[in-house]
Amino acid sequence: MNEHTIYLGGGCFWGLQGYIRKISGVISTEVGYANGPTENPSYEDVCHDSGHVEALKVTYDADVLSLDHLIQYFLRAIDPFSVNKQGGDVGIQYRTGIYYTDTADKPIIESTLARAQSFEGKPFAIEVLPLSNYYAAEEYHQNYLDKNPNGYCHIPLGLSNEPLVDDNAYNKPSEEDLKALSPQEFEVTQNSATDAPFSHNLTDEFKPGLYVDITTGEPLFVSAHKFESHCGWPSFTKPIAKDVIKYYQDDSHGMNRIEVRSRIGNSHLGHVFEDGPNGSLRYCINGSALRFIPKDELKGTKYEYLIP
């Protein structure tokens, strides 16, 4: 076992601990107070602007879970642009940060954040600093959500069950990649065109398998979340993971819609609506933006870990 430790600030530490401790490769977690100006603060002190951050001490097996991947899991649980606020919690103690004790971690942290930030187009508000001090929080805070199953949590704990689609495993499409697309695939993904309804064979494709971005190969959707919407386009209730899709306001054609684009390729995919089955969403996706890989063809590929 290759034990390593990192400290994370991501809003209320109850929810962050409940989420991170479920990730494969995490050995142990502890909540506490970090990088403040005074020694041994109490929860009351921290809640009254002591300057400490509510932090999660994460000990993990680096042979199972890389620091890069751990940070990617962390990013999906926070708002990286928010300053001193996560969810409904406001205060300096709720600032986001990554605090290291091994200087070799700093370039890994910075590289991971820079890569993720490049997909967003604006800077993150996440501080990256050496750990200057850390004090374990009171016992009643440790594993709080285990002791209080209905307790407050600003993080959907189910996020830990979503597969991690490594943002370093796929590349933005080159000119040659784009030239390999059909004219319709190019128009849809690069110029936000729309397939004619019922025109693409993937609309009626319901075999088990994986749907990836046709420009990059990044996994986007799985067949388990696909449904017959009778709208004329492939429809899904959700993406394979929260972080593979980007959302943009779209007021074109006199309509008020939410456009969805792929994370790595920035491909136009379609739109998302609130009329999915049983109160879920409907991701209405152009078949020309997708490549379907049947389940029996995933074995032996880089997608094998996504086989349910």
Question: Where do the PLM segments sit?
Answer:
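Flexible coil/turn and secondary-structure edge motifs
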Residues: 1-308
